[in-house]
């Protein structure tokens, strides 16, 4: 218990007390209006956000002047219509302040991480928390495990829970009051961390603010798992304290012992199974084990009790299913993953005797659900609900090459993201939809037919829809030494998958 108490001890010297004045600095809004967080796999235009037209140094200065002239910035929501700051341009100015506020609130987290990097060696631990650790887990570990449980991170029942979570990190009272103001202004922010919603479905003009709140909530829910993983003999680490400094956390652990009517050290042995694995992507995580079904049930029970008693998070146990890997498929990272038992017969010749031996090998498979992928293409208006390609409206001054490049880049992005699929037939259907949608768009622009347009462009049009690996392999390998079908059956995981992807968020 002394080790746990020291492990969770708060470093008061790193708490940030003077964040609120940064709202009056122009460079904060310059950082906030960086469009990097708003990237989309379909390259949706940013004009609808209003940044390109309105976001300028003059408007930022005007905003700061209004905040200086205001007697009190933090006001009740009921009086917001009478206030000059959030009156006529309430939506736009509130958007600017909320995104600038998100940048400011990220500062304490960044400073603590940099400090930990300077003081400790966290290379191994950092890799464990990276999305890149998911790929080797799928390829090397999952096929050897027995049980899996895919769980949605529970969401808070009250907005004040989010404020209290950040209060453990930030002691700046005005910043916390401003946070309450924004949470009550955007009352629909509860959908931010509702399991059935994804971050990409949130209001785009407040995406950075919501992303910050979401990540803070995820770290809070994940904290107990990080600690238990550190205690495991298989995944020891010296840097978990970076993300585990929580007010009264030691008291919560003590209370957990009382609730479960068990000594904490006796309870901890349940989590020391070296075959228990944990991976997470956004709002969903997986617990997998080579152990028994009873071990998985104990993990489930402890996590549900811990979240409900100490984080006031409601998680329905009946929605946490424990399944055997060999007869269950789970949806994760945009793939429908499963472990299949492949049997084969091997013939052995020994002198005059011959034998036939049956061998069984667990094989990990990943499939791209065609319904989810087609649904995203329908949402982007490249085809109708039946999957038939349709033309898109384009600007009159757009050149043919720009239109073709845009359609080709969209397909390459989708193919790049889903290159880890065991079977590529779904991607061929998407290529057909995008290619024909592009042809219909160009034919509509030139007031021609699709057939005539394709005949005029010829093979140059088809080459725009080749993926990078298809182009490279066609140049490096001879057809007889590297059959084309082989490249379509091999899984390729790209480590630059860092953008938020709509297809990976829905089950």
Curated annotation (Swiss-Prot):
GO terms for molecular function: RNA binding. Keywords: Chloroplast, mRNA processing, Plastid, RNA-binding, tRNA processing. It comes from the Eukaryota. The keyword tRNA processing applies. InterPro entries: Domain_X (IPR024937), Maturase_MatK (IPR002866), Maturase_MatK_N (IPR024942). It is found in: Plastid, Chloroplast. GO terms for biological process: mRNA processing; RNA splicing; tRNA processing. GO terms for cellular component: chloroplast. HAMAP family: MatK (MF_01390). Belongs to the intron maturase 2 family. MatK subfamily. Usually encoded in the trnK tRNA gene intron. Probably assists in splicing its own and other chloroplast group II introns. This is Maturase K. The lineage of its organism: Eukaryota, Viridiplantae, Streptophyta, Embryophyta, Tracheophyta.
């Amino acid at each position: 218990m002394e080790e746990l108490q020291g492990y969770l001890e708060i470093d008061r010297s790193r708490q940030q007390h003077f964040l609120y004045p940064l709202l009056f600095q122009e460079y904060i809004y310059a950082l906030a209006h960086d469009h990097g967080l708003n990237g989309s796999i379909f390259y949706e235009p940013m004009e609808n956000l209003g940044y390109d037209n309105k976001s300028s140094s003059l408007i930022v200065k005007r905003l700061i002047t209004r905040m200086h002239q205001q007697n009190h910035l933090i006001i009740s929501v009921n009086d917001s219509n009478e206030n000059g700051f959030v009156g006529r341009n309430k939506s736009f100015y509130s958007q600017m302040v909320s995104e600038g506020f998100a940048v400011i609130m990220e500062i304490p987290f960044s400073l603590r991480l940099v400090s930990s990097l300077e003081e400790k060696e966290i290379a191994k631990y950092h890799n464990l928390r990276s999305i890149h650790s998911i790929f080797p887990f799928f390829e090397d570990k999952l096929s050897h495990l027995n049980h899996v449980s895919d769980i949605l991170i529970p969401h808070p029942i009250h907005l004040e829970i989010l404020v209290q979570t950040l209060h453990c990190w930030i002691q700046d009272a005005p910043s916390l009051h401003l946070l309450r103001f924004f949470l009550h202004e955007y009352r629909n922010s509860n959908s931010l961390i509702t399991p059935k919603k994804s971050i990409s479905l949130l209001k785009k003009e407040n995406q950075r603010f919501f992303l910050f709140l979401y990540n803070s909530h995820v770290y809070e829910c994940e904290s107990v798992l990080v600690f238990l993983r550190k205690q495991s003999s298989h995944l020891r680490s010296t840097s978990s304290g970076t993300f585990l400094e929580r007010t009264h956390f030691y008291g919560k652990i003590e209370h957990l012992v009382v609730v479960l009517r068990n000594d904490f050290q006796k309870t901890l042995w349940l989590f020391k199974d070296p075959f228990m694995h944990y991976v997470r992507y956004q709002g969903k995580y997986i617990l997998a084990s080579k152990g028994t079904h009873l071990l998985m049930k104990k993990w489930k029970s402890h996590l549900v009790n811990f979240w409900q008693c100490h984080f006031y998070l409601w998680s329905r146990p009946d929605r946490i299913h424990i399944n055997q890997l060999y007869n269950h498929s789970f949806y994760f990272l945009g793939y429908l993953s499963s472990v299949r038992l492949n049997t084969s017969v091997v013939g052995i010749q020994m002198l005059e005797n011959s034998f036939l031996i049956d061998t069984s090998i667990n094989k990990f498979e990943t499939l791209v659900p065609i319904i989810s992928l087609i649904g995203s293409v329908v949402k982007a208006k490249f085809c109708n609900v039946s999957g038939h390609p349709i033309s898109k409206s384009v600007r009159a001054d757009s050149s043919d090459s720009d239109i073709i490049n845009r359609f080709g880049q969209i397909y390459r992005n989708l193919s790049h993201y889903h290159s880890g699929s065991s079977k590529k037939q779904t991607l061929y259907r998407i290529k057909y939809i995008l290619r024909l949608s592009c042809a219909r768009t160009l034919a509509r622009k030139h007031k021609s037919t699709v057939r005539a347009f394709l005949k005029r462009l010829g093979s140059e049009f088809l080459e725009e829809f080749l993926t990078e690996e298809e182009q490279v392999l066609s140049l490096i390998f001879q057809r007889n030494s590297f059959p084309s079908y082989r490249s379509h059956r091999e899984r390729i995981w790209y480590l630059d998958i860092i953008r938020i992807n709509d297809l990976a968020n829905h089950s």
